[in-house]
């Protein structure tokens, strides 16, 4: 396994990360793994040298964090980088979500209890709330860093102009700054290449993209799996005619290289400038093994052009 700095920080993370959305309670999503199933995936990730695990308070209504907390007890805390997120609805009250100082302080304390740890390595905003007071959010996040409950800050899926506003607010006031962005990025979704990716490269912010194989669309696993059959959101993201052309190009390159489509798709993400550690949401050991093997696959410039040539821009999400 290769280890790289997360953006301009001194924190070293593995070149691939383990996503824990699939760890939790089947009453939340039928395809998630229980504690023992999650343990098998986690142990294999450790064997591969993966040291960054990403979860969220919202996943399985907190159960994912509880499972991650149980799993990290098996290894020295210093060897694991734990990332989690806040901002999602965690109750019925009007302040049980979002990025007010009140909710952020309550959310971090609840996450620490579920994780069973004294600190969170990377604390990230998650589902964006347009009414957020950015100055209040950044000042509250800075206070969490100063208390020692949080070591580093990150964001997930925020409109670029608001991200830049928050970033420069923190810079002007000498506050703790974002070191990472978790964004939706793969061969079928490249919208962030216009603004977010260049900005992050210029400012020294690490990129830990999710869905590097587009929920299975890029490797022919988009149908017939339990998640695909129960997750309608996948088909709102992917499935355009141009997506089929990209998928065919992935299959063509994979055949010529003697690799799997998943490995080609992941190798493409890994070779993009500024990408630090794509997140693997594996719930099967063989898929995790397959993904790790992509680290040894280097695409030629001609292959990259072949993969990128069919992309059609998408409407803005925000």
Report each predicted region and the residues it spans.
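N-terminal binding-site loop/beta-alpha segment at the start of enzyme catalytic domains
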Residues: 1-80, 316
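Short, acidic/polar
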Residues: 32-45, 99-115, 163-167
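Active-site mouth loops of central-metabolism enzymes
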Residues: 23-36, 90-102, 126-132
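Beta/alpha (TIM)-barrel catalytic core signal, keyed to glycine-rich beta->alpha loops juxtaposed to Asp/Glu
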Residues: 3, 130-314, 318
